[in-house]
UniProtKB/Swiss-Prot annotation:
Protein name per the record: tRNA-specific 2-thiouridylase MnmA 1
Gene: mnmA1
The entry's keywords: ATP-binding, Cytoplasm, Disulfide bond, Nucleotide-binding, RNA-binding, Transferase, tRNA processing, tRNA-binding
Family matches, as InterPro entries: MnmA-like, MnmA-like_C, MnmA-like_central, MnmA-like_central_sf, Rossmann-like_a/b/a_fold
Similarity comment text for this entry: Belongs to the MnmA/TRMU family.
Subcellular location: Cytoplasm
Bridged cysteine pairs (disulfide): C100-C196
GO cellular component: cytoplasm
Major site of localization recorded for this protein: cytoplasm
Organism name: Geobacillus kaustophilus (strain HTA426)
Amino acid sequence: MKKKRVVVGMSGGVDSSVAAYLLKQEGYDVIGVFMKNWDDTNDDGVCTATEDYEDVKRVANQLGIPYYSVNFEKEYWDRVFTYFIDELKRGRTPNPDVLCNTEIKFKAFVDYALSLDADYIATGHYARINRENGQIALLRGKDPNKDQTYFLSQLTAEHLSKVLFPIGELTKDEVRKIAQELNLVNANKKDSTGICFIGERNFKNFLKNYLPAQPGEIRSLDGEVLGTHDGLMYYTIGQRKGLGIGGKGTGEPWYVVDKDLENNVLLVAQGKNHPALFSTGLIASNISFINGDVRPRTFACTAKFRYRQEDQKVTVHIRPNGTAFVEFEKPVKAVTPGQVAVFYDNDVCLGSAIIDEVIKMDASTATAAS
């Protein structure tokens, strides 16, 4: 009987390398594919994609599997990066990694894998898929510190129908141990951090190449001018570092609480529990449920509003215009427009939506939040 073919997205990192190994052990016909999504040279003039592809080649040779490289730079620019820049222009804080999964890793890459006669595709994500009773469910990875369902939350059951997540049942330590036992060349390679196309580089320096900075005033909520900002796009709600206005007022740290786009003003408040940092709900659009529109119009669940945040109890109200009003059981700090609200039922990731508007807490409920 012909072996089932799996095309594995290999990044040069340890997770996807171990994923490829596990699939080969299970008897699949495994092909490794490296996706080049960004024409990338770091601050030292080194093309990190070239280094990563070298690691893919070395690991593939160690595992005895064929490998290819595919260039998705144009798709990435058109479908992910332009959105990222547009959102920043709107004063929002986008999450390009979620869109990269939806548009590149589970769309463009799937199309490419099918051209290689793949039965399945696989990645090194820490997530699990449950296929029972004709339904596909996306479940959190076994390692709570590494669970990546947040980034996969805009996928659909159709996306996931041909996907395998071989390391979803493992912890990061277990994955590293397997790589070390196999003497894989990248067994001790550190995890990549930051937005994929920025990597370890300075965010401000990177953005200057694409968006002209427009410095403006930093003001308190009372209207007092406290300093100048470098451009609203460089700041996010809840940010404390890099404001350059310490030592004023009560002496407590200052936090970004809002952006006034019209007047190019960054609004700040003092104290980590200032009421202006908290919200009681949000309005979201681009709602995507893994299994389509099967939820009731109003339902209770938990949610995350940023990666690795503790789950928050919420009630979701789907509105006739297709947006959602998400009501928080308790006020939540630093919820940010442009970010992704991801909904869960215990371990099951239900789907997600893009945060459009945050409903700020009024001062009377401040004590409950602090």
